[in-house]
Amino acid sequence: MMQVNSQKYAVVDLEATGAHAMAEIIQVGIVIIENDQIVKTYQTDVNPHEALTEHIIHLTGITDEQLAKAPDFSKVAQEIYHLISDCVFVAHNVKFDANLLAEKLFLEGYELRTPLVDTVELSQVFYPTLEKYTLGHLADVLQLDLTDAHTAISDAYATAQLLLKLKEKMESLPKELLEQLLPFSDNLLFETGMLVEESFKKAKVMSKKDYQEVGGLILRRAKAIGSERKLSDDFELNMALLGLDAREKQSRFAQMVKDDFQSSKISFLEAQAGLGKTYGYLLPLLQLAQDEQIIVSVPTKILQDQIMANEAKKIQEVFNISCQSIKGPGNYIKLDSFAETLHREGDNRLVNRYKMQLLVWLTETLTGDLDEIRQKQRFEVYFEQIKHDGNLSEKSLYKDVDFWNRTYENAKHSKLLIINHAYFLERVQDDKAFAAKKILVFDEAQKLILNLEQFSRRRVNVTQLVQKLEKHLDAALPTLEKRLIESLSFQLSHLATRFYQNQEIYVTAEDAYRVERAAKELFALNPEWRYLCLEGLLSLFAQPFTDFWFETSFENEKRQTYLNASSDELLNFQEFLPETRKTYMVSATLHISPQVSLADLLGFEQYHYMSIERDKQTSQRIWIDEEMPNVAEISDEAYADAIAERIYQIRQLDEQMLVLFNSKKAMFDVSERLDAVELHHLTQEKNGTAYNVKRRFERGESHILLGTGAFWEGVDFVQSDKMIEVITRLPFENPKDLFVQKISNHLLAQAKSPFNDYSLPLAILKLKQAIGRTMRRENQRSAVLLLDPRILTKSYGKIISDALSEEFYISHQKFSKSLTEIKNFLL
C-alpha cells in the first residue's frame, strides 16, 4: 500500500447504472487537492456494456450512444489507481463511491486502501441549520460551482469546493470547541474525523469578543443593537432604505393600516396573498408606535421563523429596531440537560453526531431555538431530553445565559415581538397584561378559528400511556396498585381496540367516566403516578369537556392512537383579548360568505372592514376534467382506476406533480395502482411523514407526490419552477366532524345555513389555499387539474367556479384536450 499524504485529497464522484451494489460505473470525475489548492482534474466515461434505464438517462444526461464509444473500466483502472492511491479519498456520500470504485479496482488487481472522508456528515456537523445536505442544496447555499449537476466531474468539482469551504470553516472555529469535538469525531463515518483533528491543530484560541465559555460550553456572544433610527412617514422611502421597491397595492395597503390606526374599533384588513402585506403593516406601525410594543401573531412556528429571518432581520439591520420571537419553552435548548448528555456513554453513533452538530450550533445561535436544527425530527427522543421545561435552578451554571429566560425577558422590552396564534392563546389565558395596551396584528387571522378549537381541546397519546403502564406491571408493586394499573390499561386498550376494529371513533360519556375513575383511583392510591404518566390524562378530565373521541396518526413510521376531548361550544375570541392600543386582523379571506364573516365567528360585533381588490393570476391556470366520473356513482375501485389512469398520462409531460386527496383510503388505493404499473411515486404516510415525503420529492426522488391533510394548506412548494397540481375532490369538511358540528349549531342558532354560509365558502377558501401551495413566488408556473365533476353538475358548482374565476383563468373540457393545453402552458 502506498504511503498516504494527509494533506492531499482525491475528491471523487461516480455516475453508475444504479445505486445498488451490482451497479456498473459509467462516468468518473476526480479532483485532486493539495495544500488547499485544486491542482488536477480527471474525467472519463466508462462503457458498462449494458443499456441505461430511462431514470439514469434523465438524471445524468448520459446516453447509451455516448458510452458505446467510451473505454472499458479495465483500460482506465491503472490511471485512476495511481492518481488517487496516495490521497485521502473524499466524496459526498463516500460509502457508495468508495465501495463501488474499490470493488472495480480490486477486480482489475488494484487494492485501494486510502482513508475515507464523507462531506455529507461534515456538512451536517459544521453547517448545522441547513434543511438539506444534498450537493445541489449545498451548492445553492454556499455558492459552489455546480453548473452541470449529476455529471461526475461537475459533482466532483463542487464537492472539492465544499471540502475547502468546510476546512476553512472548521479552522475558523475556536480551538476549545474543536477540542470538545475530538472525542466525538470517531462517530463520523470511516476516517472523516481526521479532518477535525487536522483543523484542531490549525485553529486559534477563542476570541472573547465573539464567544464565551460557560460551564464547559462555547456560546456566541450577543452583540448590542445601536441607537434606533426613526422611520419616515413615507412608506416608499422606508422600503427604499431596506433596498426594496414598494408595489402600488402594497403602498395602498400600508396607507389603510395607517389611516385606521386611531380608530378604536378592531380593523379587519383583506388583501390578496403575495401583496407584501408583512412590510405593509410593519413599516407604518413601527413609524406610528411611540412607546407601545407591536405584537405580530402568525399561525405557525414556521411562518414565525420566516418573518424573523426575513422582514424582521432586515428591519433590525437597517433601523436598529429590537425584534424578538418567542415560543413555548419546549422549543428552546436547556443547556443543563444538553451538557449532561455530553458525558453520557452508550449513545449510538448518530446521536453522538448530533451532539457535535449542537456544539457547533451553540457557537452560532443567538436564540437557542431548536427549530433552527432542521433535521431534528430524525432523533426526536434525544431532542425531547434536551428541550427546555420552563424551569431553571438558581444553582444552574447556565442561569445567566439560559436561552428561554433570556428570550422571555427580551420579549418584554423589544419593540417588535413575533409570536404564533397558539402561543398567544396560551399566554393571555393566564396573563392578560401580556397584550394589554399594545398594538396587535393577527396575520392570516382566518386560522384563529382552528387555533381556538385546538386550544379548547386536550389530547393524550394512548399508545404511549398504555406502554408506560404495562412497563410498570413488571415492577415490585403492591397487589392493589397492580390491579388498578391493569384496570386502567384494560379500559384504554379496550376502547382503542373498538376504535380500530369497529371504527367506534366517539367515546360515550359512560366509557369516559370509567377511564376517569380508574385514573383517579390509581392517583389517589399513589400520587406519584401523576408525574410518572398520568399528568395528561388527569388534566384532560379536569376540564369541563363533553365530547371524547379517538384519532390516529403515524409518527416516525409508527402508528399512534390519541384520546381527544373538547367542549361542545365555540370559544369566543373577543373574550381572550384585553384592552389593546390597536388590533388588526389581516387575511386574504375575511368574508367567508355574504352572511358569515370571520369577525362573526370570532365573536366581534364592532369592527372596521377594509379590502383591496384582487388581480387575476396569469402564471397559474385551472382545468376541469369533464370526463371524470362522480365517485358517488361508481365503485371505489373504479374511482381509483380513473385517477391512476390520469396520473399515468400526466406523467408523460415530465413535470413534477402533486396529487391532493381528501381521503387517505382513496390515496392508498391509487398508490397501489401506480405500484402495479411500476410508476414510481411518493405517498404520504406510506413513504414517510408530510415533511419527509416533501423533502424527498424536492430532492428529485420522484416526480409524483400523493398527499392529503397538511398538503392542502400547510406545505408550500417554493423550489419548483413548474408544477402540475391534481385536485381529486372538492375539499368539503366531514359533516360528522365535531368542530364542523359546533359551527353548524352556532349558525343554526342565528338562523343561518351551515352549508351555504360555512361549509361551501370554507371549501372554496380551502380550494384556493390548496391552489396557492404551488404558486409561492414570482417566475413559478403552475397548472391545476380539478377532477371533481360536481363543480360542473351541482347547483353549488357555479358558486365555486365564479369564486375561482375572480383570481384564475378556468376552462373545462375533455381530459385529452386539457393535457395538451397544460403541456403548452408549462412550456
Question: What would you call each of these model-derived segments?
Answer:
Residues 390-416, 421-526, 590-602, 736:
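Signature of the SF2 helicase/ATPase Hel1-core->accessory helical subdomain module
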Residues 2-114, 128, 132-146, 150:
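Conserved non-catalytic scaffold segment of RNase H-like nuclease domains
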Residues 234, 292, 301-414:
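A substrate-engagement module of RecA-like helicase motors
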Residues 262-283:
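Walker A/P-loop
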Residues 627-635, 689-788:
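Conserved RecA-like P-loop NTPase helicase motor core
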